[in-house]
Regions:
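Short alpha-helical segments in extracytoplasmic peptidoglycan/chitin-binding modules
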Residues: 305
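Conserved catalytic motifs of ABC-family nucleotide-binding domains
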Residues: 302
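Short strand-turn-strand beta-turns centered on an Asx-Gly dipeptide
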Residues: 308-313
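Serine-dependent protease modules
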Residues: 2-16, 23-281, 286-290, 297, ...
Length: 357
């Protein structure tokens, strides 16, 4: 009995000593407890990020004439439709970025700043192919948002959407980055969207998608929902793309893009196997315009393109983005397969027409 009592006392003493040592280790060397340290590092609030950026998100009110098919006579066949949207101040000089669809066909546009001032902006330029528009207001030096880098976003990063949903000014919703580089949505010509589960509602269009540091990483543009009872999936235009569009509009009044005069399509697995292509790279040229740069470089319908400027090409969308990222006069080295043999061609980019074929 005495031996059992001694054993229990020894066991309890060991447990107490072990807990005491563990407690001291956590106090002295918290870096040795990564799980606990990681929890301590998480922000309890994103209020600081909102404070840094919310004043740079403005409200937009537009009016446009809309044809009313139910009008009883010709005099009342049109009605005035009022819409709410958002824009982001990206330059203290008064430059604002919003969506092209926000200002398209608007008969009146008004901007309301976070301090309540209201003015009519000038439209500096638009780019329908990325759904972006650059506006400017003359209200002195304004508080511009800090630009982040959308290329550094990772799936799972926390993001906040700031906008004017349903006319409710400076509303903030939280979510994560669900995906990057989203395409095939048939929303615009050049799709490279950030997908997020942050709520993006009517009026959020043109608003800011920010990271946890309060930096702009995207321009909110669209939400997809299966039906009225389904929570939608939000999409934003990456700030890296928006930055390039803005600079071109500032310099040229429009966006000037390269053009190769070809129509690519994705390869199926069966086509890739038949051609002996072991990697996932490769797109099929289904059309090469006779008077285009690709035809001048002897590219032909039926060619399979593997690389453009040394970069493996995996999809139609990627090929279009590479082509559009050039400027007229740039040379694009193309590597491909024709009738089982590899070839290389040098395409001199032309200027993409406003309504490309």
């Amino acid at each position: 009995m005495a031996n059992l009592r001694s054993a229990l006392v020894f066991l309890l003493q060991s447990i107490v000593v072990g807990l005491a040592v563990a407690f001291l280790v956590v106090l002295i060397r918290p870096d040795l407890m990564p799980g606990i340290a990681a929890q301590d590092d998480r922000p309890a609030s994103y209020a600081d990020a909102v404070d840094l950026s919310a004043a740079s998100v403005v409200n937009i009110y537009t009016k446009r004439l809309v044809q009313d098919s139910d009008a009883p006579n010709a005099r009342t066949r049109f009605r005035v439709d009022t819409s709410f949207a958002s824009a982001v101040i990206i330059d203290p000089a008064g430059y604002l970025v919003t969506n092209y669809h926000v200002v398209f066909d608007a008969t009146e546009i008004r901007v309301q700043l976070s301090d309540g001032r209201i003015t009519e902006p000038d439209i500096i330029g638009v780019d329908a192919e990325t759904d972006l528009a650059l506006l400017k207001v003359d209200l002195g030096s304004l508080r511009a948002i800090r630009l982040g880098k959308s290329s550094q976003l990772r799936i799972g990063d926390v993001v906040l959407a700031i906008g004017n949903p349903y006319g409710l000014t400076t509303s903030v919703t939280q979510g994560i980055v669900s995906a990057t580089g989203r395409g095939l949505l048939n929303l615009v010509t050049f799709e490279n969207f950030i997908q997020t589960d942050a709520a993006i509602n009517a009026g959020n269009s043109g608003g800011a998608l920010i990271n946890s540091l309060g930096e702009l990483v995207g321009i909110n543009t669209a939400v997809l929902a299966q039906d009225a009872g389904t929570e939608g999936i939000g999409f934003a235009i990456p700030v890296d793309l928006a930055r390039g569009v803005v600079e071109q509009i500032k310099q040229n009044g429009r966006v000037i893009r390269g053009y190769m005069g070809l129509v690519p399509d994705d390869l199926t697995n069966a086509e890739r196997t038949a051609l002996g292509i072991e990697s996932n790279a490769g797109i099929l040229l289904v059309e090469v315009y006779e008077d285009g740069p690709a035809a001048a470089a002897d590219l032909r319908r039926g060619d399979v393109i593997l690389e453009m400027n040394g970069e493996p090409v995996f999809s139609q969308r990627q090929a279009l983005l590479i082509s559009a990222s050039t400027v007229p006069g740039d040379e694009v080295e193309v590597t491909g397969i024709r009738e089982g043999a590899r070839f290389t061609a040098l395409v001199t980019a032309g200027e993409r027409p406003e309504e490309p074929r």
